[in-house]
């Protein structure tokens, strides 16, 4: 099901910049907007701003295609892809994703189908190879008129006395250069270029984790229409993802306490397999698995920046905040914030007096969505959440609201947000009931080793 993207976004109503205005701007700056980073967030912002007639230059540290995790999109990505004009191309390279499933202690899995989401808009998403997906978006930004420079590392961003910024960078050959811009959008992801330079980045003390992951062939898929599901398995000290990709490949990874990962002895591929197989159900699906390429490991520390923007600059996606990816929120939050940022920057360049108000509203909305995901993330491995996910009930449409959250509908849908408040109450009541019931023999979590 597709819906009109204009129903979900504040469309840009103003006209393109006039020739006289552009001529005056050209005298002072090399470009109107400088975007740092060529991932989904950067490409989204660059596409939409270039389409509006602004001069956009994007600097990307690497050369595409390149490997990246974060391969599971959400249904709420679809209207953004449609707005960009790439939905059909993404569908062609992606694996159809109708649901997310969470295996229970009894070995059965519960499939949370997106077509049951409260206020359903789009009833599916796609699993994508990020190398293909990110390159597609970057090439589309070029086609829309953005000036793309790959293998270009940003070294510093300095405010100019006459307004705007001077961005110093260096190419792969070591040659230095600079570009002046009226506005800077930091879409550098976990590089957090401006967050680090301005001293804004703050680690979340309770959200410490690390990830190990790889691609495999021979991993069994869910039967029938569930074949494209993302599966999330619980471990005693973390969780496992399985994301089905094209050509029979399965992305498999584990997110665990970093202290557990420090216990590793021997090869990373063996450690990854042993960790994943710490869940009995995951072990069964990995019985015939063959690793494709080399496994990788990365720190997965959650953080946020103290500020989201200032005069002439703005953070989007992971450049502002990063949360545990258990609900596949990363690419959606990146692209959604980038689309909103494009609207904000367009309006600010036309009327700078609006910037403070627009940035305040932008941050309030993004923090609201991050807060909804974070509340569930912090409680995912608790006995209470395990009980509620294994025994879902749709009283007052609460289950449908949780599915809407899993679909990414965490910003503006009031019926969903109201019922998520009810879910929090149900969680508290369930926690009290479990405490009053007293200790009892713990059920098998089927997560023995990790």
Which ranges hold each PLM region?
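C-terminal helical "tail/cap" subdomain of flavin- and related membrane-associated enzymes
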Residues: 4, 10, 343-450
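N-terminal FAD cofactor-binding segment of flavoenzymes
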Residues: 68-106
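FAD/FMN-dependent oxidoreductases across multiple families
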Residues: 93, 260-344, 350, 354-360
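Predominantly flavin-linked oxidoreductase catalytic cores and closely associated redox partners
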Residues: 140-282
